Amino acid sequence: MTVNLTTANEFIARHIGPRQEDEQHMLASLGFDSLEALSASVIPESIKGTSVLGLEDGLSEAEALAKIKAIAGQNQLFKTYIGQGYYNCHTPSPILRNLLENPAWYTAYTPYQPEISQGRLEALLNFQTLISDLTGLPIANASLLDEATAAAEAMTFCKRLSKNKGSNAFFASIHSHPQTLDVLRTRAEPLGIDVVVGDERELTDVSAFFGALLQYPASNGDVFDYRALTERFHASNALVAVAADLLALTLLTPPGEFGADVAIGSAQRFGVPLGFGGPHAAYFSTKDAFKRDMPGRLVGVSVDRFGKPALRLAMQTREQHIRREKATSNICTAQVLLANIASMYAVYHGPKGLTQIAQRIHQLTAILAKGLTALGQKVEQEHFFDTLTLNTGANTATLHDKARAQRINLRVVDAERLGVSVDETTTQADIETLWAIFADGKALPDFAANVDSTLPAALLRQSPILSHPVFNRYHSETELMRYLRKLADKDLALDRTMIPLGSCTMKLNAASEMIPVTWAEFGALHPFAPAEQSAGYLQLTSDLEAMLCAATGYDAISLQPNAGSQGEYAGLLAIRAYHQSRGEERRDICLIPSSAHGTNPATANMAGMRVVVTACDARGNVDIEDLRAKAIEHRDHLAALMITYPSTHGVFEEGIREICGIIHDNGGQVYIDGANMNAMVGLCAPGKFGGDVSHLNLHKTFCIPHGGGGPGVGPIGVKSHLTPFLPGHAAMERKEGAVCAAPFGSASILPITWMYISMMGGAGLKRASQLAILNANYISRRLEEHYPVLYTGSNGLVAHECILDLRPLKDSSGISVDDVAKRLIDFGFHAPTMSFPVAGTLMIEPTESESKEELDRFCDAMIAIREEIRAVENGTLDKDDNPLKNAPHTAAELVGEWSHPYSREQAVYPVASLIEGKYWPPVGRVDNVFGDRNLVCACPSIESYA
């Protein structure tokens, strides 16, 4: 008997949905006998053979976990007091187990379909209420990417809204976190904004500025009274943004109460691990008058068709996918998973618990300061919350080294000063250890538990916080566990059903890939810890850069961008800097096809480029002659082309090499958007067929989960001539050009992609692309008799997604794409992407992870819906009172008085398979218009649910 003794590549079958016999059946239905034959027919001849992965065989799950455990073990976990916007904290175990490690939470998509997203929408509304309460400003968004990005958004927000229209100068306090100032400078330069960094205490004339950023408390620890300064800025028609520590705001006067127009910051210390810099949820709050100019997503309270309260994403017409180059921001994701952790941290601790944590931290800091002063050490701050700057003079290096020898990290402010930041994990023993470092042999002070607060009396908070019942109920673990379960049960995520969203790649996020994320070796490392302490992360990132270079054909990778939008931005900045280095600053025209995702033109605008739109032909491809004409017309100013490949229409355009050649011949660079990379890995490589730069979505192609709307990771790959212009960071060799706060962005979720690639190997990655193409074509073929497939390649095939045209059905029956999307909920499915890239269509991307059984279940649902539409067309079903117009149907409606002309069974059990397991939407169809006309973006009163 021959026994296979190797475990190589065994994970591939776990990741890929269809079994071998199903694969053959699906291929046969398309007229092919192998995946290679299908691939050869789909991939254009001109780009075949451009991908040679060169990766080893896939490791087994056990082998990969053992290998990454060894890598993680190279990180050294010192006791860290660096601060600078990053603080160690405790992630409560019920939140860790029931939210962060729960696929019901981390595999969900952005809540664009509110009826199946009420759970995470409620958690996000809690987050917005938390931020609004603590900052004293009435409107808060559902999170941004990090504090530095939020500061950059605040700067451009102030520029748009300031009445000081003649000004291009923005004041930024020198007491801001250094990484924030770096990101501000990066964002400002292409927009022609002059960032003036200075000490606000020395400002005599503020009339030159359209806005200002102040840090509260300051990065060095000082707590300044900004009331008078804020009034001065307002008198000069400037707006004021305050970067505030959320935990400190439980004790300090909130920014909104001293006149701030915007508050921004990080919610990281609300239960989210350091993670070597991310991901963390930033926040952004502002005055009600400015709500329509606020960046990011906003959860609002509306009603469903029964008049019951229901939540939804509000004011979506602000978002970049709609406003394109006129958008106020290019950000198209939030940090939902992290915002929800912070939200539940506040729910679990409540107002008293949060205040006690803040008081304890402040008291320990005051005790530390008193003891250091007694030891003869000069403390610079009179008023502080949790951070001290110590004037250590000539002893700075000696004291720093002494601390390091005891596995303690202090912040090196400069050659003569050290910083110490106390956090939730600091103990009395830690304070005494710090005293010993500075004692130089002197007797240690007695630990006095009662030391007077050093916060200014005039700035002590008087207003209450978190009075809503949700923050005052779930304080036992039992209650919180059940609350999290109740919310999760309201939502549809990948743990229940396929999510066939086109352009979103909702594939499996395997359990083995997720396990390392919550290891302390990855989670407890400060992003500015010395390099020798982060050897594991440096190996991980080096490995990952090599893997992604192999997958894309590029020469270098930057892992810093912490979202696809930031990857786009970093890519265009690299192109811009390249042209500038050649003395061609005039090159500022960016060509973008009309079919492009709205992020593309929004990003080009942010990068200081002018957008020129090129046409698409009747088949959805780039009109090459129109592109050629516009490239020639703008050849002296052409900077770049942004193009998605395969196209947003779901096909491999055959002219891609010619398109790239046209741009290069006219002096431009080619940016290939990697949103659809899941169709290409192992089959063709953008860096080999004409791309100069691409961003990748690790949260799509490379298995990082969507988290209900973030986190994402958007690294960029570049050819060698663009390598010098990759994002830099103060903690890296290249200092300029940071696009986010941490040097490696959302570093703590990079192990997910490392695990995926290591377990799939070269053969598995190629097979995943082939199965993604097979699954999409199988759906396309099964449904084409019922719904027109809008675009195909010249051979009648699609890439990894297909677009169904529902516009004729609207004309014949009055049934809209929205009706079909909502009816799919009754069948237990998340809808495909609606009305993008073409209005009135559904774009379906099944991914390689879905089995034939699940694909058939979806196709059966779509066919059954088509039969219902046909019944409307022929009059069997009423044109207004039918299962589609009334979808989705709730359990409450089922047991209530039934007045519809169709049966209860048809409403909620339209196919027999649902009897085995039925998802019940918690609300009926949500009224979008009501929600925007009656905007409420904080927790409503309990009475409203009566």
UniProtKB/Swiss-Prot annotation:
InterPro entries assigned: GcvP (IPR003437), GDC-P_C (IPR049316), GDC-P_N (IPR049315), GDC_P (IPR020581), PyrdxlP-dep_Trfase (IPR015424), PyrdxlP-dep_Trfase_major (IPR015421), PyrdxlP-dep_Trfase_small (IPR015422)
Key words of the record: Oxidoreductase, Pyridoxal phosphate
Gene Ontology cellular component list: cytosol; glycine cleavage complex
Record-level GO BP terms: glycine decarboxylation via glycine cleavage system
Gene Ontology molecular function: glycine binding; glycine dehydrogenase (decarboxylating) activity; pyridoxal phosphate binding
SUPFAM superfamilies for this protein: PLP-dependent transferases
Catalyzed reaction equations: N(6)-[(R)-lipoyl]-L-lysyl-[glycine-cleavage complex H protein] + glycine + H(+) = N(6)-[(R)-S(8)-aminomethyldihydrolipoyl]-L-lysyl-[glycine-cleavage complex H protein] + CO2
Keyword Metal-binding: no
N6-(pyridoxal phosphate)lysine sites (modified residues): K700
Enzyme Commission identifier(s): 1.4.4.2
Cofactor(s) this protein cannot do without: pyridoxal 5'-phosphate
Domain of life: Bacteria
Record has RNA-binding as a keyword: no
Class of enzymatic activity (EC top level): oxidoreductase
Family the UniProt entry places it in: Belongs to the GcvP family.
Complex and partners: The glycine cleavage system is composed of four proteins: P, T, L and H.
Function recorded in the entry: The glycine cleavage system catalyzes the degradation of glycine. The P protein binds the alpha-amino group of glycine through its pyridoxal phosphate cofactor; CO(2) is released and the remaining methylamine moiety is then transferred to the lipoamide cofactor of the H protein.
PANTHER family: GLYCINE DEHYDROGENASE (DECARBOXYLATING), MITOCHONDRIAL, GLYCINE DEHYDROGENASE, DECARBOXYLATING
HAMAP family: GcvP
Designated name of the protein: Glycine dehydrogenase (decarboxylating)
Source organism of the structure: Pseudomonas fluorescens (strain SBW25)
Organism classification: Bacteria, Pseudomonadati, Pseudomonadota, Gammaproteobacteria, Pseudomonadales
